[in-house]
Structure formats: C-alpha cells, structure tokens
Amino acid sequence: ALGGLAEKYDLKVIEDAAHALPCSYKGRAAGSLGDVGAFSFYATKTLCTGEGGMVTTDDDAIAERIRTMRLHGISRDVFDRYQSEKPSWYYEVVAPGFKYNMPDTAAAMGIEQLSRAKLLRERRQSIADYYNSQFSGLPIDLPPAAATGDEHAWHLYVIRLQGINPRRDEFIQALADRGVGASVHFIPLHVQPYWRERYQLKPDDFPVAYDVYRRCVSLPIYTKMSDADVERVADSVKLVLASFEQN
C-alpha cells in the first residue's frame, strides 16, 4: 500500500528498521522494503556499537546525498586529502549538513558484528522461545509472534499483565527484589509533561495506548544471558505471579 502511494505521488519511502537487523519480512531483508532503511546501533539494540547507526539504499543519488549530509555538507569528492591537488586542510561545504557521521572505532565494531548478526538473533530467539514455553497459561499476554516465514528480532521481550488492576509497578519491584531487572517500554507520549501540557491531554484520551502502558513489562533478553540466567528470570516471573494471586 505504501509503495503504491509513493509511486503515485512520487514520494520516497523511509523504512524505520531500527531494531530489525538481521530479520526479513516476506522474503525481503529489513531495510530493503523502501527506498531507504535506517538502523540503530545503540547499546540496547540487536547489534551494538555504543552509539550510531546505519542507512541502507540501492539508490546511488540518495546514497551520495546521505554521505554529504552526514558530515556538515562536506563533499567526499573535494575532501579526498590523499588524491586531491588541493592542500590537505582544504574542504568545501556543498550543501546544508549535520554531524551524523559515526566514529571509525564504532564502525569497526559494527562491521565485525555484522558477521555474527544472525547468530546473535538466534540466541535471542532461543531465549524468547524458552520464555514462551514457561509462561504459557499464566495470567499474562505474551509478545506477538512473527508470521510464518518472517523473523522476529526480539529486541525486547514485552509481556502484558492481565486483570483489572495489573499492579505493574509492584510486579517490577518484586522482580527486582529477586535480583531480576525489568523495565517498561514505552511510556506514551500523551502522558509526558511536554505533550500533556502543550495539548491539554489526559491519559484516557488514548485509552488503548494507556492501557497497554499500565500492563507492559520488559523482561531481560540479551545475547550474553546464560541458560541459568534465563531460567532464573522465568522462575522469578512465575513465583511473583503466584504470590500476586494469593494476595
């Protein structure tokens, strides 16, 4: 649908694939579904360089435009200090630009991890599979599964507590008391002070988003978790839920 609209109105499709490396959707790699794909390599992402990210495209003109914009609008053609006849200190700004270039050290870490990207995803998949098997039948909603033939990145593993009073904050604290760190992803924008005050919003203005927020808990899922770590998280979740049912 988006592709058809883009073609009709001569638009470019930018795909937010921040968490999706190295997954595929309907046989196509994440980041290749539009004209441009954008990935994040922040510390919590499936491939990490500390900071930074990656842009993919098969359009040479877009690629060159991105290369120029990422470093203050400096053209790589005129910034080649090793082949140009101009002095080494010389450069030209050919367009408005930004400071978006990744440090070489971060890029080197990312290139090395690319060779292990599928292996890292498979470890996350195995953790998610274990959680799913352990949590089946409990009073929680499990994360949506990927469609047949597609892949899930498992950047996060988010459960939703059931019931009229989900007691989410108590649940997270009870896990913490057992040495299991859990978090919430994410807090809806309409309850954040800036948007709430600017647009005079109330929590119930977006009831579905607010209800999911009240119930959601992100459990630990990262590639360096040992099997014992994963089992301890699952056991702790079951014990805390059992204690809630008794109170």
Protein language model annotation of sequence segments:
Residues 1-3, 8, 24, 60-247:
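PLP-dependent aminotransferase class I/II
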Residues 10, 15-49, 89-94:
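Conserved active-site segment immediately N-terminal to the catalytic lysine
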Residues 32, 44, 56-57, 218, ...:
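Ser/Thr-centric signal marking residues that sit
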Residues 40, 53-58, 111:
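Short beta-strand-to-turn element immediately C-terminal to the catalytic PLP-Schiff-base lysine
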